[in-house]
Curated annotation (Swiss-Prot):
UniProt name for this protein: Delta-like protein 4
Carbohydrate-modified residues: N79, N109, N162, N297, N394
Encoding gene (name): Dll4
Region entry Interaction with Notch1, spans: 186-188, 192-196
Native organism: Mus musculus (Mouse)
Protein's UniProt keywords contain Transmembrane helix: yes
Transmembrane segments: 533-553
Tissue and organ distribution: Expressed in vascular endothelium. Expressed in retina at least during embryogenesis.
Signal peptide limits: 1-26
PANTHER family linked to this entry: CRUMBS FAMILY MEMBER, PTHR24049:SF30
Length: 686
């Protein structure tokens, strides 16, 4: 099951869990009423009159909640009417469809309370047979009222009601609607066989899992029998999917290290070398002689390291593999005692008396010489020029001189040793083999050589034990400390560390991976914008420094006129200082007024000034703080309301009268008396 499907399944189960109480609160079922027989022999109505010419009978059924005393009112559980079913007396047949259906169906959509009230009325109609309840002139024949309890079930409850005029036989029951179960038809269960569950519904509404499934909602498959619980899993029944590092039909076989040539494993990614092999990947042959038999002509092979060996030759042979014979006579080709002589490319047999031929195989004897031994019979051939011996059993040879060796055919398998036993032979088997010809292999695992619950594997060179966790050695006899990191549980290049206990481990994930085994990749977070932040901070600092420089320059410029003004004031004479009128005593109202200078008798240098225009540039050294020379053009500034003001000159009799305004203005006026006599100077300061 994929992660996406698991997530969808969990959401579906959550939704089911939320909706389940609501489903249990509602219910659905059917109250069934089967009319069987109605008898009205006299054709009488409830009012005592009779039907003419006969009653045309139909029924009205009203089902409602339990009432100890039945009262008229709504049929709370349902109602139904029948068409005309017969005349005075009749039997009602079962009918499953169409008009006149029997049993009558009264469905309900609530939890069945277990009690009810039922009113069955028989009516006579003179009108329509199919919808008689709407016809005018209907008359009541009889009615019966049943009050009681009724459990949900498929068994019909049969009853019969009689009165003085009529008799009604009927039966009834309550059954649940499709997919509803339980004592009150309130348990909803819909069988399904899909991704969200595989089950059928029991009579009580409980789930019954289909074969191959289990779990609360039958959504968990039952894996193949024997599938290893930890090493395998399944997404459908009878399946066994191996987890990483395991293989086999039941996921009980570990996968050795990639590249392991001649080795096995007891845990995934291990490479335990077979006997005779070494190296990291068990690819170095430590027993080359056994595996390849490089030495020829019966020579002895000795191992001398990985892929190394030495051949010890038998007499008469030489070469790296003893493949070269030293003498052509080494095979004793001459028979009947003939001697062999080596020649350049061949050999020559020197036959003893009585024999001839290339290998001294022919005899010059005849039967008269009794050449046959051990009871052999002589038979002449070629008109007496030669003979042939017919040997008795167990003897052979041209003269029956050799005892039959029944072991020459090498009948013993698997290295068994053949032994002659008179007319028969026996095989002496090597350990681990048995049988007449040593053809049966005795399992080396029968002796249970593996200790501590190790698994024995019977191989050609002997048993090999697969040890359980915590043990090692050829026979699993050595107890070792378990290393939880030995199986390589961490993925994506993570570093494994052994935890507090031997069976625990911790994976140190590389950047970009998370999870207990570092198996989940994550999106790399964007790097912090150090360049943008540094640039922004630098710009702010530069702007602050620039503002500070501008403010400092402005302060220096503003301080310079004040210093010059104070210096000019300090350079004035005491007389000039005494004739300096403070600026606070003059008010400029920007109105043209007359300025009168009264000099007494001597008026040569003084006069009356009318509409005197004040030039603010006359005394630039006395500008107020914040004023700039040349900033303001020559403008007319007039005095306001007339307030007498006297200015003293060098001549006591000379007075300057001015009209001043008491109102404040943006500018202050200063009147200076020049050091020259009989001369009045007015200076203004902005």
């Amino acid at each position: 099951m994929t992660p996406a499907s698991r997530s969808a399944c969990r959401w579906a189960l959550l939704l089911l869990a939320v909706l389940w109480p609501q489903q249990r609160a509602a219910g659905s079922g059917i109250f069934q009423l089967r009319l069987q027989e109605f008898v009205n022999q006299r054709g009488m109505l409830a009012n005592g009159q009779s039907c003419e010419p006969g009653c045309r009978t139909f029924f009205r059924i009203c089902l409602k909640h339990f009432q100890a005393t039945f009262s008229e009112g709504p049929c709370t559980f349902g109602n139904v009417s029948t068409p005309v079913l017969g005349t005075n007396s009749f039997v009602v047949r079962d009918k499953n469809s169409g008009s006149g259906r029997n049993p009558l169906q009264l469905p309900f959509n609530f939890t069945w309370p277990g009690t009810f009230s039922l009113n069955i009325q028989a009516w006579h109609t003179p009108g329509d047979d199919l919808r008689p309840e709407t016809s005018p002139g209907n008359s009541l024949i009889s009615q019966i009222i049943i009050q009681g309890s009724l459990a949900v079930g498929k068994i019909w409850r049969t009853d019969e009601q009689n009165d003085t005029l009529t008799r009604l036989s009927y039966s009834y029951r309550v059954i649940c609607s499709d997919n509803y179960y339980g004592e009150s038809c309130s348990r909803l269960c819909k069988k399904r066989d899909d991704h969200f569950g595989h089950y059928e519904c029991q009579p009580d509404g409980s789930l019954s899992c289909l074969p191959g499934w289990t779990g609360k909602y039958c959504d968990q498959p039952i894996c193949l029998s024997g599938c290893h619980e930890q090493n395998g899993y399944c997404s459908k029944p009878d399946e066994c999917i191996c987890r990483p590092g395991w293989q086999g039909r039941l996921c009980n076989e570990c996968i050795p290290h990639n590249g392991c040539r001649h080795g096995t494993c007891s845990i995934p990614w291990q490479c335990a070398c077979d006997e005779g092999w070494g190296g990291l990947f068990c690819d170095q042959d430590l027993n080359y002689c056994t595996h390849h038999s490089p030495c020829k002509n019966g020579s002895t092979c000795s191992n001398s390291g990985p892929k190394g060996y030495t051949c010890t030759c038998l007499p008469g042979y030489t070469g790296e593999h003893c493949e070269l014979g030293l003498s052509k006579c080494a095979s004793n080709p001459c028979r009947n005692g003939g001697s062999c002589k080596d020649q350049e490319n061949s050999y020559h047999c020197l036959c003893p008396p009585g024999y001839y031929g290339q290998h001294c195989e022919h005899s010059t004897l005849t039967c008269a010489d009794s050449p046959c031994f051990n009871g052999g019979s002589c038979r002449e051939r070629n008109q007496g020029s030669s003979y042939a011996c017919e040997c008795p059993p167990n003897f052979t040879g041209s003269n029956c001189e050799k005892k039959v060796d029944r072991c020459t055919s090498n009948p013993c398998a698997n290295g068994g040793q053949c032994q002659n036993r008179g007319p028969s032979r026996t095989c002496r088997c090597r350990p681990g083999f048995t049988g007449t010809h040593c053809e049966l292999h005795i399992s080396d695992c029968a002796r249970s050589p593996c200790a501590h619950g190790g698994t024995c594997h019977d191989l050609e060179n002997g048993p090999v034990c697969t040890c359980p966790a915590g043990f090692s050695g050829r026979r699993c006899e050595v107890r070792i400390t378990h290393d939880a990191c030995a199986s390589g549980p961490c993925f994506n290049g993570a570093t494994c560390y052994t935890g507090l206990s031997p069976n625990n481990f911790v994976c140190n994930c590389p950047y970009g991976f998370v999870g207990s085994r570092c198996e989940f990749p994550v999106g790399l977070p964007p790097s912090f914008p150090w360049v943008a932040v540094s640039l922004g901070v630098g710009l702010v600092v530069l702007l602050v420094l620039l503002v500070m420089v501008v403010v400092a320059v402005r302060q220096l410029r503003l301080r310079r006129p004040d210093d010059e003004s104070r210096e000019a004031m300090n350079n004035l004479s005491d007389f000039q200082k005494d004739n300096l009128i403070p600026a606070a005593q003059l008010k400029n109202t920007n109105q043209k007024k007359e300025l009168e200078v009264d000099c007494g008798l001597d008026k040569s240098n003084c006069g009356k000034l009318q509409n005197h225009t004040l030039d603010y540039n006359l005394a630039p050294g006395l500008l107020g703080r914040g004023g700039m020379p040349g900033k303001y053009p020559h403008s007319d500034k007039s005095l306001g309301e007339k307030v007498p003001l006297r200015l003293h000159s060098e001549k006591p009799e000379c007075r300057i009268s001015a009209i001043c305004s008491p109102r404040d203005s943006m500018y202050q006026s200063v009147c200076l008396i020049s050091e020259e006599r009989n001369e009045c100077v007015i200076a203004t300061e902005v």
